[in-house]
Amino acid sequence: EETFAELYDAVDSGKSDFENINGLCLRDGSSFKYTNPRALISDLNTVPYPAYDLLELDIYFRYSTIPYSVDAYNSRRRLSTVWERGCPRGCTFCSHNGMSRIDLQNIYGSGDRKLGEKLVREVDKENDTFQAPARWPTAQYAVDNIKLLKEKYNIDFFMAVDENMTSNLKWTKDFCNLYLDSGLSETVKWGTLGDAPSVAVHPEIIKIMKNAGCTYISFGFESAS
């Protein structure tokens, strides 16, 4: 996100030299080269909420209905949110294995996966994101996001399209408790994504989420362990 913002500003100002922007892969004749690595964003509370006002929301709301649950099907003013960055799982087929911290380490860092050495980018050590492929803002940040969408756009449903909400039990419990306290759980229902093993190990999370207005979980059955 930070790389894209800097790249946009550079293009908008008419610049054509992007080598000072961290986190890019640039063409170099018939080959390519990397600019300096960019650390993962360690404090996601610093990320501003999306500029929903730049979207044609009347058109977006027209297609709110989705057949995932009764409330999702009946929704007329649905919007999507995303708070999590990354995923704690390491599924071999997933796109995260092509854009994760570990892959960037193989370009920039030190350590040999085959020898069992830790795969660490020095830049992550320096910026407090060491071994943190999955990160979340505070649960209050997420609840405040929904409050804003309700007040500004009168939404009746939201999709939390985080990679894997159920994988972080504490965060999900905190979010659900705060969401209940906010009074939004009756007027703004929601759904999200999760993995089956997390729920198999902690089945109580389903009831907590349901009580807080969650009407569906789109499960990934990557493993039954």
Question: Residues of each region from the PLM?
Answer:
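Radical SAM [4Fe-4S] cluster-binding motif and immediate context
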Residues: D53-S225
